[in-house]
Design a protein with these regions (language model features):
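Short N-terminal "domain-start" leader segments
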Residues: 1-42, 51-53, 58-62, 66-84
Length: 84
């Protein structure tokens, strides 16, 4: 896949969600922004996607409960948000 911007989330043990805006190339990736504000993450991602004329993807997640009753959030794919 060519250069693109991706938004992903990480749920900490204490319940805090951290959002990451990542610029990905064929062989490398770099974190452009990270923080706990969802709106700021999407604003940064849209701004960078438009500035660099690259597509923007959001990571889709699915909740699963294992045999011990622990809930896990698993990434299942990417959704294309904007093509420039």
């Amino acid at each position: 896949m060519n250069t693109h911007i991706q938004i992903s989330r990480h749920l900490d043990v204490d319940g805090t969600t951290t959002y990451y805006v990542i610029e990905k190339n064929k062989n490398s990736s770099s974190i452009v922004w990270n923080g706990t504000c969802k709106q700021a993450a999407y604003q940064v991602a849209y701004r960078n996607a438009r500035k660099e004329n690259t597509p923007l993807y959001d990571t889709l997640y699915k909740a699963q409960t294992d045999k011990n009753g622990v809930k896990h959030i698993i990434p299942v794919g990417n959704e294309l948000l904007e093509v420039n």
